[in-house]
């Protein structure tokens, strides 16, 4: 075939280091893009990088720069890549029918980039009955102005933090306070201690609203448990990752930090819901 070959779920613990050269060796004649399990990283082969470079000519210079990499490893470009590589609309009708067949009647969409255009698209999908499920949509602060219906409702303001590019602190505070003014909760993606400390500091400054939460909270040192409790924040954790990825954690995480990973009982005992 000549179309994109797309893979997801890559992690170093499974395949080691993956880059443009490796993909060129194994798939030189077809454009390939592989997504890291974290969701932050895409790795492309040379043919894929050439296609993206041509498609990106219409973009602003700073956007083209984000899509340039000698080793084919592109960080935090999910939305840009999607816009450049998607030639056809995703098969929503088929996916929705399959979900309905399994008895799924509602979807909670936590995509951080959801915006008014996404809201309008989902509205149209429901009107056309391509999308049968009810949807609760979280995303950007601008979603607060969406016209809700019995089948489409507004969720949290979703903030996805990366240690390498944390948002301006004042901007982060503004996002929290403006969302709270509209009685909209905040859901913050935190998978590192740095991100969690940054988030707790922001909530301590801006204040919390019942229902604000930390998503993942992958690493929680003991000193931060009390702060979570004091601020009244909830935590949505994933202890199943300890089972699924435990071998990698044993290798990559210092032994004295193993108890910090995906806490459950210690949070419950501290009164953190």
Task: Describe the role of every protein-language-model region.
Residues 149-162, 231-243:
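Non-cysteine beta-strand/loop elements that form the S-adenosyl-L-methionine
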Residues 140-146, 218-224:
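Short, conserved secondary-structure transition motifs
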Residues 219-273:
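Active-site-adjacent C-terminal substructures of enzyme catalytic domains
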Residues 43-44, 147, 165-166, 224-225, ...:
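Short, charged, surface-exposed secondary-structure boundary motifs
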Residues 1-131, 137, 142, 155-191, ...:
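Divalent metal-binding segments
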Residues 119-124, 146-148, 196-207, 227:
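Distinct, well-ordered alpha-helical segments
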Residues 127-132, 205-210:
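Short helix-capping segments at alpha-helix termini
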